[in-house]
Structures are given as C-alpha cells and as structure tokens.
Amino acid sequence: MVVRLTALLGISLIFAGCTSCIEFDKQTMVFRHYPKTDTLVIWQQYEGIHGEGEGDELSDEEIEQLESVLQGQRTFFFANWIFEYDGKAVKQYIQDLKKELKEGAADKDPAQPRSLIASLKLLQKSIDIYNVSFYLNKQGQLSAAQQVTLRNVSKHIKAANAFLRSLIVIGELDADDEFTQFLLDRSVENELEYITFEGQRLRVQWPMSAKHFKQLAVDEDVIKKFTQTGGTVKHANGSLWVEIGKVQSADTTVSMRLSDAEFKNNAAEHVAKRFGIDRKFDPAKARAAFFRESDQHFKK
C-alpha cells in the first residue's frame, strides 16, 4: 500500500538500509506555483555532497548511485535517498501494474490499478527534471543544482486525493485508534481534499485523533527544522496538518540542514573528472534566471 500511495504522488520511499550512500548535508528547495497554467516549478540545491562510506574516494556503489541521478529523472526531498521522485522506478511500477492486470492478480477491484496506471502515465508526461551543474559552495564543498517542472498540477492532486479516499474505503489505511478510524470514514463521506495547493501554499490534512497524534513517533528535530524554515506541523480539529508557504507569496522556500556530521570531501575529485565542476557557477543568479524564464513561460 505504501508503495502504491507514494508512487501516485510521484515519490518513492526506500526503506532498505544503505551503508555506503551518496549524501548531502543541506538542501534548499524553492518552488513557484502558477495556478492559471497549472504548473509548478522547483529549484533544488544540494550542498555538501559526499560519500558516506569509509575512505577518501567514492565506493563503486556510491559512483553507481551518482550516475543514476545524472542519467535519470530523479529529484530528492530532504531525506537523502529516502523520499525521492525516480522516473525509472515509476516506469517499472507501471509495468508491474500492467502485469498484475494481465495475470488477473490485481487486488479486489481492477479499476484501482487502471486508474493508478493512467495517473502515473500522466505524471511521466508532465514532469521534467534538468540537472543544472555541479559547483562548490561558499565553504568549498561539492554542491549541485536541479530544475524541476511539473505540469497538470491540479490533475495530479485530484488523482492523489481520490486514490487516498479509495484506499480508506477498501481498508488499506485502517487505523488502530477507533476515533481516528471514525474520522477517516467521515472524510470519505465528505470527500475531503487531503492535499491542497492554493497560491504558493501547499497543505496536507490527514484525519487523526489527538491521542493518535501524541503517539506518533515523530522526530522532534525534523519538526523543529521544518518550522524554522516557515513550515507548520500541528494537530487541530481532528486532523494532522502539515503546511508550507503563504498563498500570496511570490514563491516558497524550504531550506534545511540534514546533517551536522563532519563533511567528507571524497566526491569532488570523481565528479570533476567524470562530469566537471563549474567553479564560476553562481547559484543565486542561476536561480533568479530560472524563475524569470519560468515567469515568461507560465505566468499569465
């Protein structure tokens, strides 16, 4: 269920432990939503890129991971290889769903995987990820920038909300907490929009009792960092609320340090030889240029 849910949202969850991974110490994400053209553009900056494994050079596994990002449609969301959009994984998941349907192994209602396939195909057509450049930040650490463009935003959100309701109906998201289950069932009856995007504000609302919320094993440090960057995580009116951005803002910025560990300068040499490092790259100027160009294309 988790895989299906996150696939619909365009996000992969990777739970397998990784003893030798490419990591980044800080991420800055700036997004601008264009409601009239139903488009979202995102500027991604990853700073302090390095290999987590031992040694002064990247391991074969880390090199393979780096290659997969540069050659594929992948972008990350504040958790180093845990939350990401992976175009290759989405393609494979579509193939797996088609195989299930062909073999008659789709669970319960075949309409659900068919709808999911259609949504994922639309997502594939709607998203573009461009790897801009490797560069060195002010601390001399290996860093990189990406540009992401997502079209048909409202269709993706509508599909995600409908899919969440369908999962509640078939019992995939049942809660042990009795009152939370009541709230979930009522949200289906009321056709609650769990995910909304208004102006530059992204909001997620999930039915949950106050008791259930208090029992959640949430990393307080992560919440603190998220709120410091302007986000909100709270429980109110029978729901968990996660919110970032303001409706009338020009755009929304989320910048978080993901690690306080000592930086390992073990990736720059390989990247310089394999891909090149733009030592004159100015991320602030490049970001401004990206949004100017986006305004010209999508602002109406």
Put a short name on every predicted segment.
Residues 6, 25, 131:
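Sparse, context-dependent recognition of short Cys/His-centered cofactor- or disulfide-binding micro-motifs
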